[in-house]
């Protein structure tokens, strides 16, 4: 059991980081979608919320379609390479999302982020691989706790770090940060994934 502690901690952190990346958009997504769609010239207040739903759903659609493939691939090549692939996808696509300049880009990037990240399913399979029958419920509960903690931290990070030019000033008081008010939370989550 002692030899399994490091992988369990790593698996806990993988799920935590995934959930932070998934949920950090919640506080700012409505404004981000509105900004992107207004720049594209095709939104009104009646359809804004519909587009927010599309952006949110695009991530889960990507996961729905590609998690079975990633799970099967993890059976062949091992759990760790697929978990690493998911973290790399998180890093790349969180940065790309924060820099999206059109609504279609935001939708596409969120879809690709979901498609490249089957880490929750692979983590559960990994725990099944390294756990006895008696250990399994507690370890799956640990993953559930990580999931919940990420759901709590993600929106906090997204809300606090949005619009740093106005919120923090100083080094963020530049035209670039003013033009990219949603990039800092995405970058922060991307850096967590990269570590």
Predicted segments, located by residue:
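Extracellular/periplasmic helix-loop-helix junction of adjacent transmembrane segments
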Residues: 32-64
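Residue-level signature of mid-helix packing/kink "hotspots" within the transmembrane helices
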Residues: 56-68, 118, 151-152
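Cytoplasmic loop-to-transmembrane helix junctions
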Residues: 48-51, 135-142, 181
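Pair of pore-lining "gating" transmembrane helices in MFS-fold secondary transporters
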Residues: 4-36
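Cytoplasmic helix-loop-helix junction between adjacent transmembrane helices
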Residues: 108-147
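Symmetry-related core transmembrane helices of the 12-TM Major Facilitator Superfamily/SLC fold
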Residues: 179-195
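Glycine-rich segments within core transmembrane alpha-helices of 12-TM secondary carriers
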Residues: 140-166
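Conserved MFS/SLC helix-loop-helix module at the cytosolic interface between two early adjacent transmembrane helices
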Residues: 64-103
């Amino acid at each position: 059991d002692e030899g399994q502690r490091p992988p369990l901690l790593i698996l806990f952190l993988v799920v935590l980081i995934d959930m932070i990346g998934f949920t950090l958009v919640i506080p700012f997504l409505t404004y981000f979608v509105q900004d992107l769609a207004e720049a594209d010239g095709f939104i009104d207040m009646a359809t804004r919320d519909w587009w927010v739903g599309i952006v949110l759903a695009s991530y889960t659609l990507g996961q729905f379609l590609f998690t079975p493939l990633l799970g099967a691939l993890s059976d062949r090549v091992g759990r760790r390479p697929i978990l690493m692939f998911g973290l790399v996808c998180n890093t790349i696509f969180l940065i790309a999302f924060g820099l999206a300049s059109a609504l279609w880009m935001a939708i596409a990037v969120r879809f690709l982020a979901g498609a490249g990240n089957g880490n929750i399913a692979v983590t559960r399979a990994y725990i099944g691989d390294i756990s006895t029958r008696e250990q399994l419920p507690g370890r799956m509960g640990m993953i559930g706790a990580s999931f919940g903690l990420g759901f709590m931290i993600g929106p906090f990070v997204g809300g606090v770090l949005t619009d740093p030019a106005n919120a923090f000033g100083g080094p963020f008081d530049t035209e670039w940060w003013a033009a990219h008010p949603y990039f800092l939370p995405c970058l922060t989550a991307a850096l967590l994934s990269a570590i």
